[in-house]
A protein has these predicted regions:
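Conserved catalytic-core subdomain
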Residues: 2-16, 165, 212, 216-343
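Short acidic-glycine loop/turn motifs at beta-strand connectors
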Residues: 21-29, 55, 62-67, 74, ...
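Short, Gly/Pro- and small/polar-rich lid/capping loops
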Residues: 1-36
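N-terminal cap/recognition module
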Residues: 34-78
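Extended Lys/Arg-rich, glycine-bearing segments that form polyanion-binding/interaction patches
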Residues: 5, 77, 82, 88-201, ...
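Short glycine-rich loop/turn motifs
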Residues: 17-19, 56, 142-144, 162-163, ...
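Flexible, glycine/charged-enriched surface loops at secondary-structure junctions
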Residues: 94-96, 112-121, 206-209, 260-267, ...
Length: 343
């Protein structure tokens, strides 16, 4: 095992043993290759560099309480990558190839898989890019699929420390009938200006509204939105939201725990009725939110604040959902949904 302080990894890049690559050319995928160098060589005219012809995924592998290694729902990531690739008109790996490369990259980098109990995991970043040289705006005919990995700590340090968020009314993450529901790098680029501005103002995340009317909640800059009221788990229904696998899993767990699940448009004004609010995604599972500020513009001094629970700790129902997901991932509790692939 690598000589690392597993409890202080943070969420960032760290060199591992190998990355995996697989090229698509002449209508077929080639062999999967291991590379010890995580630099790649592509044409300066590659479509990915000029027209953002790329999509990616994020998932995790965990070393369990029983010593087994588990991948959490890689089949869902494979399907979502295929959906993103189809939208930008490029070839996508089959679900079988996707999962094969997930398993292989974990095995080749097993020394970097954090131990059980460290609140850390191995983050996998499947990445698909268009690589053939081109000048015109068109879908790529040649692609490179890469399976990358890195050991990571919890995105927010593993403390479930509630966050301070602002609503963006003057900037949108996505466009109506646009790419918001696909996992494309360009969507994240679109959120950087408003996120950087909000960060300078002391906020930890940005909550975006529907881009057509700015009346309904969409999602955060890098994660989905959920809320809890009474015994209901509530999350937005919108065509401009990325379909989060974590959110989908939380909905299933909520039902298992006897909660009512509501996926529907969520008006901004409804924030005042929620007991708990959180961000959810692969990197965090759940980050509770203790305050959301609504402003006419990000830099406006006029503020309508909404408060949820404690500034110091996660709400009880969010915590219960979090513990069940993490328990399944770590092999501490039974996986009744057959979500995990055990290596």
């Amino acid at each position: 095992m690598a000589n690392l302080d597993w409890t202080k990894l943070g969420f960032g890049y760290r060199k591992t043993n190998t990355i995996l690559t697989c090229y698509y050319k002449d209508g077929k995928w080639g062999p999967v290759e291991s590379c010890t160098d995580d630099n790649i060589s592509i044409s300066a005219f590659a479509g990915t560099l000029h027209y953002s012809i790329e999509c990616f995924e994020g998932l995790k592998a965990f070393r369990g309480a029983d010593g087994k290694v588990r991948l959490f729902r890689p089949d869902e990531n494979a399907k979502r990558l295929q959906r993103s690739a189809a939208y930008i008109g490029i070839a996508a790996p089959s679900e079988e190839l996707f999962i094969e490369m997930c398993i292989r990259v974990v095995k080749e980098n097993i020394d970097f898989l954090p131990p059980y109990g460290s609140n850390a995991s191995m983050y996998l970043r499947p990445t698909l890019i268009g690589i053939n040289p081109q000048l015109g705006v068109k879908s790529s005919t040649e692609c490179l699929f890469m399976m990358l990995c890195a050991p990571v700590g919890a995105y927010t340090g593993g403390t479930l420390q509630p966050s301070y968020v602002v609503i963006s009314r003057d900037y949108d993450r996505a466009a109506p009938n646009g790419t918001g529901s696909f996992k494309l790098g360009s969507n994240y680029a679109a959120s950087l200006y408003s996120y950087n501005l909000a960060h300078k103002l002391g906020y930890e995340a940005v909550l975006y509204l529907d881009p057509l009317q700015h009346k309904f909640i969409d999602e955060f800059n890098s994660s989905n939105f959920f809320a809890i009221r009474d015994n209901s788990y509530i999350t937005p229904q919108s065509d401009t939201i990325l379909p989060s696998i974590t959110n989908k899993s939380l909905e299933t767990v909520a039902r298992e725990l006897g909660m009512t699940v509501e996926r529907r448009p969520v008006p901004v004004e409804e924030l005042s009725t929620f007991e708990e609010v959180g961000e959810c995604g692969t990197a965090v599972v759940i980050t509770p939110v203790y305050q959301i500020d609504d402003k006419p513009t990000l830099e406006s001094p006029e503020v309508t604040p909404y408060y949820f629970g404690s500034k110091e700790q996660c709400g009880p129902k969010s915590l219960k959902l979090y513990k069940m997901i993490r328990g399944i991932q770590d092999g501490e509790i039974e996986d009744p949904f057959n979500w995990c692939i055990t290596l």
